[in-house]
A protein has these predicted regions:
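Metal-dependent polysaccharide deacetylase catalytic core of the NodB/CE4 family, i.e.
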Residues: 21-112, 118, 129-134, 157-169
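C-terminal active-site subregion of NodB/CE4 polysaccharide deacetylases
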Residues: 1-18, 22, 84, 92-93, ...
Length: 192
């Protein structure tokens, strides 16, 4: 089974939502509470609140902290607050249950992971069994092109989670490649 997750709350997440719906891909959008501030700081356009609500009504939302700071660079009490309070803030913003968490850049520690699992049902990192970063040359994929890394993961694991950032899909002009990939892998199962 292929799943998809997208981080950060870029305006192009709306395109990912459309692809996920077209091919019936279970998708989680991991957003920091302050996704708009993050986008402006990083130089890309954020989702509007209305766009975020549209996605939240159709797909699962996961927490990506409040401010998108690297948790391992923070004091434990500050990191724990980012983990815990982001859940409640996102639940209030979108009136949905938040059960999944993704630490920014996958940076966590054993103690923070234990804390996270007391609050959330699951935590997605950037590396691990069946995880593939949709990126032209990612360290998370052992610096392999993502489609090659996907083939290796697919041989080893039944469940694959493709993850990425829609602002990177914009920057690296990956949209046609992504659409082609899902058409090839899921075209007979997805909506036409």
């Amino acid at each position: 089974m292929i799943r998809l997750s997208v981080d950060d709350g870029c305006a192009s997440d709306i395109r990912i939502a459309a692809i996920a719906e077209k091919y019936e891909i279970p998708t989680v959008f991991y957003w920091p509470v302050e996704w708009q501030s993050l986008a402006y700081d990083m130089g890309y356009n954020p989702l509007t609140y209305d766009e975020a609500c549209y996605i939240a009504n159709r797909h699962e939302i996961g927490s990506h902290t409040i401010t998108h700071r690297h948790l391992t660079n923070l004091h434990d009490d500050v990191a724990e607050r980012e983990i815990m309070e982001s859940k409640f803030m996102l639940e209030n913003l979108f009136d949905v249950k938040i059960t999944k968490f993704c630490p920014p850049r996958g940076y966590t520690s054993p103690a923070l992971s234990t804390f996270t699992h007391q609050i959330y049902e699951s935590q997605r990192l950037t590396r691990g069994r069946g995880l593939v970063h949709i990126h032209p040359d990612s360290g998370a994929n052992n610096n392999m092109p993502w489609r090659e890394f996907y083939k290796i993961q697919k041989e080893q694991y039944e469940d694959i989670e493709l993850w990425g950032h829609s602002h990177e899909f914009d920057r690296f002009e990956m949209w046609d490649e992504i659409e082609e990939f899902f058409q090839k892998e899921l075209g007979t199962h997805g909506k036409t």
